[in-house]
Amino acid sequence: MDSFDPQQLGLSPARFAGTFGSGAASVSCSRLRQVQSVLTQSSKSQPDGILCILGIDSRYNEGCRELANYLLFGLYSQNATDFEKTGFSEEILDDVILLIKSDSVHLYCNPVNYRYLLPYVAHWRNLHFHCMTENEYEDEEAAEEFKISSFVDMVRDCSRIGIPYSSQGHLQIFDMFVVEKWPIVQAFALEGIGGDGFFTMKYELQDVSLSLWNVYSRMDPASLENMLSEDLAVFEHQWTSFFANFDTEIPFLLELSESQAGEPFRSYFGHGMLSSHITENSPHRQPFVLFGNHSTRDNLSAGSFNFPSEGHLVRNTGPAGSFAKHMVAQCVSPKGPLACSRTYFFGATHVPYLGDNEKLPRTTEQIRLLSQIYAAVIEAVLAGIACYAKTCSLAKAKEVAEHTLESGLVFTELVPFKADLRSKVTFHIHAVNNQGRIVPLNNEDSLSFVKTARMTVYDIPDLLGGGGGGCLGSVVFSESFLTSRILVKEKDGTITPETSYIILTAAIPRFCSWLVEDSEIKLSEKTLQATKGDDCCLGTLLTGGKGAYLYSNSPQSGPEEGSAYFFSGGLLFSHRHHGSIVIAKEHVDAFSFYDGDSTSVVAALLIHFRSSILPHLPVHFHGSSNFLMLALFPKSKIYQAFYSEVFSPWQQQDNSGLSLKVIQEDGLSAEQKRLHSNAQKLFSALSPPAQDWSSPKLLSGKLPELDRFLQHFAIGSIGQEPVMRAHLVGLLQQPEMSPAHEVESDKVVISIVTGLPGCHASKLCAFLITLHKEYGRWMVYRQIMDSSECFHAAHFQKYLSSALEAQQNRSARQSAYIRKKTRLLVVLQGYTDVIDVVQALQTHPDPNVRSYFTIGAVTVCVEPLSCYMEHRFLFPKCLDQCSQGVVSNVVFTSHTAEQKHPLLVQLQTLIRASNPTAAFILAENGIVTRNEDIELILSENSFSSPQMLRSRYLLFPGWYEGKFDAGSVFPLMVQICVWFDCPLEKTRFVSRCRAIQSSIKPSPFSGNIYHILGKVKFSDSEKTMEVCHNTLTNSLTIVPVLEGPTPPPNSRSSPQDNGQPECYLVFIGCSLKEDSLKDWLRQSAKQRPQRKALKTRGMLTQQEIKNIHVKRHLDPLPAGYFYNGTQFVNFFGDKTDFHPLMDQFMNDYVEEANREIERYNRELEQQEYRDLFEQKPKP
């Protein structure tokens, strides 16, 4: 399985829609860092880790489930039906334990849910899988013991553990004894496999729910996408229902009550609040619909709208009991941050042009002035939002909003009321978290919250002084918006913010009106009828039809869909709410037409109008640029009819002197390009196949600025680490502005090859250098071996400085040639995080070095047999070495002949989940066989590509300035270099290496030796041999060191110049001790003979006594003894098996043996012997 398909696994694809596309890994890692930040807060009692246990093992604790869903994008929000589709029980899929530490994560799972979890977690930094293989998992008893032992291992290094005890809105009193009753926690106390004691007695537990709730409440790209595709869709549906109420009641609109009109908002909010557990009651976060003069300050500030009025109708809420001229409405998401308010009108704000210049009726004039105030309020709120997004200052935003409002009230009729209106204006910006709770705007996390900007002009008087001079009511407008900020570092080192914002509720119509008076309705109908007559002021009807969209650059208006009728002398646009809009040629300066010379491009008729048309144009179409755009969508009937019936006649100049002028894209102004782009997005969204609300196309069509904002927000939401100015354009994915990256000829390209010990990286590098000298002169950097660190940044930086100095010391002509041809190969075999190598170059103190070298590509070598310590527990940094954004190529150095080998496939799936863009290369033992693979490894610009650069900024915030913390190595792998002089015994050394594998211990792996490498001499040869032993594969290679030019001396890597030993071995393993390694190595050398101890009679063996008897039994007998052939007989007839003088014989034997021992010991003492680790005496 090389890629993840949720449908193949039986999970609902809706959960994955858009989640694991571009940037999903960065959001996942960002969320993990947010959770880990709880562990790094300055507190004396901060926990060492956060424990999250799912399923039955935590008695289905909701707090743990909520944390898992936050980190895994709602994976455990699946319903029972989704889990049944997988074919596995919920208990198996819930079998997950997470321990989150400040720089690492431990994850227990089983082989079944491992593949479900992998796409979500593979890119986490320092991830440790505690998972059995499929075969091991078949033994249920062993599987249960493994889970308990894994749990014990996870928490071994902790003293205080945080528990996400409660879910949001369901705060429970933390009870550690309830935690003690969780099944897996109870199992901790089991003897033998448990942790030797009760969990709650061994560890200090604390509830971290409140801290995590703050984390969950922040907006990030994933929660934004979820809000746009789900919450905003439901939110917009309420407004659709709201408009449907009015459209249905048009014949009886005057009898509509506030209660009827506001029912969709009230039901939506009330039902949602029942399950939201939000107790705050703020008037800014409650829905309302108020007609006419009922929308007073007192009613808007009542704090509760649970009891709407049935008696306030459109008919009776105007001045002096007349019909209302407008209404104010607000819809609020009960469990989310969305809210917006609008002011809509009952009556027309314009009079259709019928060839005369009749004065506006009094009612229309009143509504027109009210709508002008509302238009100024809209511009003020939008200006305030723009100012706040740029400055993050409420005071400045308020100042700008109020100034914009005052500038908008320029009409002579409003002059007497300016001072009075100014005193009745309020402007607020509220920050709202993801649960719909208002939070302080100066909160340090408020940047990541949705905000609502609202302006209200309270209690507007009767502007024309009629009707007894009563109050018309209030005007309200608000929008929910989200800001994004990227800190940009300039060349001079200064930091400047780059901001962006998106108005989330912009798709809700900002302006709407319904015709309620009979005179207005009749006038609209009269206009339509007049166009059909011969004496129409617009001339002859050419064609007409539905499906046209009218655009204006006014902030109040969006695309208005209606019917367009084209005449020889102008056009008429009919809208269901606004009535008829007549645009005669006498009010037009020019007609322009743009269609991009393509049948797939929206055709745009640009109408540049004169100010004389303003009384005949709805207020929200009054734009600062005095133009309208009529969009005709390709393949529509009106589109085809325009070309066949209108295009040619309009191109001919008539009495008005106007003719249709066809323009190209360069003839469009910036504002016209923006509107046309918006129309094109809307056409794309509405084109078949039909899109649902959550589709990116439709979202982009409704919110045209969304794509641009999402690119910005993806970077801005990661953190507050600055971005280099030169990188910003590429990060925001603006390819038309991003120049293709080419490596400058005077730079030295660095090719980095890394991997775990035993991965054959050195062989790959030797192969590259030997066979590919045409790439130029090679410099090779290898890590120093006599260091406890796998990678020493200071040493690497020193090497780079030396390399630059060596190049600069050459002659100018030679330097130019060599500089162009020189490449640096960096070979690192160890538990090194590649990002540390990158940061070492980026943070080099010499700017000349930083500019002289550039990284071409990073390649990691993977030996499948050397990846797992046990089960599926990876060696430290194994997965981190394959990180997206840094590594371009992954070279598999074994099992390449059998490409379907289960181990190879399993690792490829794991690495592909971690790095979807890496190229996979098969190279047995480091030997690459394809030229295209070599090109990938030696690429000069792979590392610097825009995609890689963007991934680095997203996954490694702060990397460019060396501020990204790669985390510690766990389990701690020790690298100990042992120097010696004496040759080793080859046979003993080989046998001892082979025996290491059988002594490997399970977790916590203390004392395990995994790799041995170095240079030694054996007693059977004078040659220096290079040895390399891999414990897991039990492979040992011994090859002569190739003779060649000696590298420059280095005090660290060439100790023989200082009289130190010339042989060394590097031991790599867990918790190794140098003394133990020396003792092990001594057993591989020629053993020093031991002094022999003197013998005594009591030490003689039976065999020795027998030998003495055989040798001396025929010696002369003392008087009174004779030998009968089998026994010795004395004078009294006593018989014995030994010679009567046997005691003397034994004493003689002991004396003789001791003389030999003493001679041997004297000779031994005269021999010169040095311990393996003694230094040679100086000559």
From Swiss-Prot:
The lineage of its organism: Eukaryota, Metazoa, Chordata, Craniata, Vertebrata. InterPro entries: C20orf194-like, CobW_C_DAAF9, DAAF9_N. It comes from Mus musculus. This is Dynein axonemal assembly factor 9. Interacts with ARL3. The gene is Dnaaf9. May act as an effector for ARL3. Pfam families: CobW_C_DAAF9, DAAF9, DAAF9_2, DAAF9_N.
